[in-house]
């Protein structure tokens, strides 16, 4: 970042097994490859922040593997296939379901829903990523909501929720106004949380949130 002159940006760290031969077996003394990728920060889309974004459901299901659930690994072919389902800019992200039609996460985001000022997020047990901002929101949720729960959320139940927002470590938090045919309002609690995190990240560059 310093060499590129990036004062405010994103640092992505990728770790692979390392260079080896063919096949799945690898030598114990193999040296992992660590790749550092730096990018300038994107300008915050103020319109999306104020008026919200639209999401859609993906047809391609998320893969289930309880041993890897929560980890952001490189074997994300399910997310790649799901993201290929649309080209238009109308949708910010796609929501992925497991084989029992439980909502898990987006192709690049974690998901939160609220009802009566109680916050809910899909539980990460068999699939999905426990993202950095997901955990930060869970840890700070009671500043704005009465309670926060990690639960199983079925696709058929989304009409019962008042609002929705998405998170990841780059966008932080964005409110959602539409998920397919379901319309959400942006509640005061969600708006207060968004303002809190953006003000705090400007002061500390996110370090105190992690």
Where are these regions (language model features)?
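Helix-start/capping segments and mature chain N-termini
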Residues: 2-3, 16, 21-210
């Amino acid at each position: 970042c310093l060499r590129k002159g990036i004062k405010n940006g994103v640092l992505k760290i990728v770790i692979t097994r390392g260079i080896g031969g063919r096949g799945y077996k690898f030598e114990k003394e193999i040296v992992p490859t660590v790749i550092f990728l730096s990018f300038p920060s994107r300008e915050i889309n103020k319109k999306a922040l104020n008026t919200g974004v639209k999401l859609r459901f993906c047809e391609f299901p998320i893969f289930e593997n309880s041993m890897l659930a929560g980890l952001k690994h490189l074997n994300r072919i399910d997310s790649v296939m799901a993201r290929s389902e649309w080209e238009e800019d109308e949708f910010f992200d796609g929501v992925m379901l497991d084989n029992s039609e439980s909502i898990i996460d987006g192709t690049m985001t974690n998901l939160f829903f609220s009802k009566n000022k109680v916050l809910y997020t899909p539980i990460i047990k068999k699939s999905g990523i426990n993202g950095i901002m997901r955990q930060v929101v869970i840890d700070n949720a009671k500043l704005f909501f009465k309670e926060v729960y990690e639960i199983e959320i079925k696709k058929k139940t989304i009409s019962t929720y008042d609002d929705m927002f998405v998170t990841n470590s780059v966008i932080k938090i964005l409110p959602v106004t539409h998920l397919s045919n379901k319309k959400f309002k942006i509640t005061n609690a969600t708006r207060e949380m968004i303002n809190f995190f953006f003000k705090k990240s400007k002061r500390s560059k996110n370090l105190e949130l992690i």
